[in-house]
Amino acid sequence: MVEDLDLYTGTLHYRGITAAFEWEIRKLYPTGIRESDATISAEKYVSETLKELISNTSGKKKEILMRLSKQVESDSLKSEIMQVCKDYSSIFGCFGEHLFHLNDLELNYNEMGERLSSQRNNFAHGNLDKEFIGVSALDLILLEFVVYSLQLKSYGIEDTEIQRSINELFCRRLAL
C-alpha cells in the first residue's frame, strides 16, 4: 500500500513539474520554439501531405489524420527542454552540472530531454509497469530549477539573484 502511494505521489510530482515547465514554455515562446530550416521544411511538407490526405478521406481515418496534423505542429518536450537549456543554462546550468557531478554523471541536455519525455509519457499514459528511468529523478530536480528560473525571469529578476534564490530555496550550498 505504501509503495502504491509512493508511486502515485511520484507520478503526480513528475507530471506536475513537467506540466509547469510546459506552461512556462507557452508563455516564453508563444509561437513555438525556434526550429532549424530543415525541420521547418520537413514539417511544412508533412503538414501539406496530411492536409491533402485529410481532404480526400472521411470517417475515422480523417479523425486520425487530423490528430496527426496537430502533432506535427506542436513542439516535443525534448525539443522544448533543449531550447530552454540553450537559452537559459547560464542561470541554472551550474546547479545541474553540480547535481550530476555528485552522482558521477555528465549533464547532457539532449539525453535529459529524452529521459524526461519518455518517463513523463510512461506516467501520463499509465505505463506504470515500465521500469523507472533512475537518472530522470536528477533530471526532474534540475527541471524544478529550470521552472523556478523561468518564473523568476518572467518577473524581471536578475540572473544572479535567481541563482542565489535557487541556492537558498533548494539548499544547494554552491559558491556563486
Language model features with spans:
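Amphipathic, oligomerization/interface secondary-structure segments
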Residues: 1-176
